[in-house]
Regions:
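Aromatic-rich beta-strand edge motifs centered on tyrosine
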Residues: 181-182
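Concave beta-strand-loop units of leucine-rich repeat
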Residues: 2-39, 43-56, 61-79, 90-103, ...
Length: 288
């Protein structure tokens, strides 16, 4: 399968050329012998692997990793550092899932072809310092898998994203400094996040930082979910914080007014600032 920024993150394991996940639920521990089995697949371009430690990661990178365009590091809980990855000059996509020890990124300056990077469930990684060195990066996602809340999954700041060329940002965690509006100073064109972590005013203020062309889940002030009961489906619409849940078919008029108010808030926050500058004005909706 040919991977791209549009399909790599959600690719099922059966679409990888090689699957070296260990049978243990926690990712297990992979052996040198298992890593050496890669030599039997010289044409493989995509790999999912689990159970690496610092020494076996270094071995994998030194002997085999350079042949892959896409690597998914699945449950490598004993890794304490990712420095070996700086040698991967040809890798295009990297996905990480679950680690409790890694505290910083690696030197990404030599990852000259890296287009997509996803990091999920890393409980000690709270800084993305160094991401700005990867000039080819277009797709970045960080947080908890499936958006599940975890107080240990957070970043200190988004400021380094201003120095990147990232166009897609997926965010499913907490932000320590609370400065979401800095994202409006980035190259982001598509933003996915959970709108329910914001009040209506906060989300409108954030979206107003971007041009009308912004795409993604962030531009919708709600998520949806359905429950089946005795063959009957009830669709729930979950709005921003502080707003009562809507039920489709029952609260349609209230939901329509909610969307209209949100749209008005975004438009109001985009009006030119009084000082005549080109920046956005972040006054509350309704101010004169």
């Amino acid at each position: 399968m040919k991977f791209s920024v549009d399909n790599f993150e959600d690719a099922p394991f059966e679409n990888y050329d090689l699957d070296l996940r260990q049978k243990e639920v926690d990712g297990g521990q992979i052996s040198i012998e298992q890593i050496d089995s890669i030599r039997n697949f010289p044409n493989a371009k995509s790999l999912v692997i689990s159970g690496l430690q610092d020494d076996t990661l270094a071995y994998f990178v030194e002997h085999y990793a350079r042949q892959f365009e896409f690597i998914s590091f699945w449950k490598n809980k004993k890794l304490t550092k990712l420095d070996a990855l700086e040698k991967l000059e040809s890798v295009e996509f990297l996905v990480f899932f679950y680690n409790t020890k890694v505290q910083k990124l690696w030197n990404m300056e030599n990852n000259k072809k890296l287009k997509g990077l996803c990091i999920y469930n890393f409980s000690k990684l709270h800084s993305i310092d160094g991401i700005e060195k990867c000039r080819s990066l277009k797709y970045f996602a960080f947080g908890c898998e499936a958006g599940n809340a975890d107080k240990n999954i957070y970043l200190e700041s988004f400021k380094k994203l201003k120095e990147t060329q990232v166009e897609y940002f997926g965010w499913w965690a907490s932000l320590l400094d609370g400065d979401y509006k800095v994202l409006g100073e980035t190259s982001i064109k598509q933003l996915d996040l959970n709108p329910r972590q914001f009040t209506m005013e906060e989300l409108a203020d954030l979206i107003a930082c971007f041009p009308d062309s912004l795409k993604g889940k962030a531009i919708l002030p709600y998520t949806t979910g359905a429950i089946m009961d005795k063959g009957n489906e009830t669709v729930y619409i979950y709005p921003c914080k502080g707003v009562k849940t809507f039920i489709k078919g029952k609260d349609d008029e209230r939901f329509k007014k909610y969307l209209e108010k949100f749209s008005q808030m975004v438009i109001a926050n985009r009006r030119p600032c009084r000082n005549g500058g080109l920046g956005l004005c972040y006054e509350k909706y309704g101010d004169n």
